[in-house]
Amino acid sequence: MNEAVSPGALSTLFTDARTHNGWRETPVSDETLRELYALMKWGPTSANCSPARIVFIRTVEGKERLRPALSSGNLQKTLTAPVTAIVAWDSEFYERLPLLFPHGDARSWFTSSPQLAEETAFRNSSMQAAYLIVACRALGLDTGPMSGFDRQYVDDAFFAGSTLKSNLLINIGYGDSSKLYARLPRLSFEEACGLL
């Protein structure tokens, strides 16, 4: 049976973690990005489908390529973040299922239903984006996830001619706490949950 993590870990991962809009100039190494993926890839997905594909943008050139897709409110925070991750989903994720889910012919579940394939890829890549955020926090990094961008532009600029489609962006780095907004409320258990 698993043991609960420490209260300090819960604070780091959830209750004290914040969405950051400003960044310190401390770089994030490529090795750290590899560590992030090594953690997040173990999060569960439907039939182990693992549809997320991530582009970690670390260079000025990469950020300039992304710039036209950003909403005005997300521009400065993204250009100054050490890393911006494009979390995309592979519309043909099912081609990897013989490796990832060898227990049966899971590939045919999705080749026979394009709608199911798209819903599965989008939903599960969203879950994987959340795992990436938690992995960042576990390694001492801060994040700023965003959906305010031109997805079609990103798809054309970064994924043209491929089977990838963008889902969301996540800025990653070491946050500047002086630029945090006041903590916003969350819904109570009674407002968000039910018991049957």
Swiss-Prot record:
This enzyme's EC code(s): 1.1.1.298
What are the protein's UniProt keywords? Answer: Flavoprotein, FMN, NAD, NADP, Oxidoreductase
Entry-linked SUPFAM superfamilies? FMN-dependent nitroreductase-like (SSF55469)
Q: Which GO terms describe its molecular function?
A: 3-hydroxypropionate dehydrogenase (NADP+) activity
- TM ranges are none
| The family this protein is said to belong to | Belongs to the nitroreductase family. HadB/RutE subfamily.
Protein name per its UniProtKB record: Probable malonic semialdehyde reductase RutE
